Amino acid sequence: MPRKGPVKPREIMPDPIYRDVLVHKLINKVMVDGKKSKAEKIVYGAMQILAEKTGEQPLEALHKAIENLKPILEVRPRRVGGATYQVPMEVPPRRQISLALRWLVEAARNRSGRGNYTMLEKLSNELLDAYHNRGNAIKKREDTHRMAEANKAFAHYKW
């Protein structure tokens, strides 16, 4: 741990087109090998497709999809007397966003189908699924909540 006190989180600048921090974070999650312009094309294209299919503004549709993906509870390991318990805990707001974005991009990358789908198509389909509360990323959130519910008996071990 640093001796100078807690480390302040860096401020993330909003993206140039939508002027939104969440879009910038999504671009950074999609980016591979530092190819940011490619990641921007993928994210902006996916947002346009999402807006066309939902009939909402691209930014509103993205925010709703991410809101649907945010986990409320998760389990964290806690050692008590030689045994490790999975203790359900509330997820802090910053972690909710980072988990939601991670699950979204992971689900889009693992998404398969007939034909050669581009990452743009995969991401837009996964965003649309998240918007409608379905898909692999939503399944991941539900699994996390199910684990927390199953281990509710250990909730008194919170620290």
Swiss-Prot record:
Q: Which InterPro entries match?
A: Ribosomal_uS7 (IPR000235), Ribosomal_uS7_bac/org-type (IPR005717), Ribosomal_uS7_CS (IPR020606), Ribosomal_uS7_dom (IPR023798), Ribosomal_uS7_dom_sf (IPR036823)
Q: Name one Pfam family in it.
A: Ribosomal_S7
The reply to whether Ribonucleoprotein figures as a keyword in the UniProt entry is: yes
Q: What parts of the sequence cross the membrane?
A: none
Q: Looking at the keywords, is Cytoplasm present?
A: no
**MF term (GO), any:** rRNA binding
Kindly state one GO CC term assigned in the UniProt record.
Answer: small ribosomal subunit
Q: NCBIfam families of this UniProt entry?
A: rpsG_bact
Q: What does this protein do?
A: One of the primary rRNA binding proteins, it binds directly to 16S rRNA where it nucleates assembly of the head domain of the 30S subunit. Is located at the subunit interface close to the decoding center, probably blocks exit of the E-site tRNA.
The record's annotation in HAMAP family points to: Ribosomal_uS7_B
- Describe the family membership recorded for this protein in Swiss-Prot or TrEMBL: Belongs to the universal ribosomal protein uS7 family.
Self-association state and partner proteins as the record states: Part of the 30S ribosomal subunit. Contacts proteins S9 and S11.
Protein name in the entry:
Small ribosomal subunit protein uS7
Organism, by scientific name, is: Sulfurihydrogenibium sp. (strain YO3AOP1)
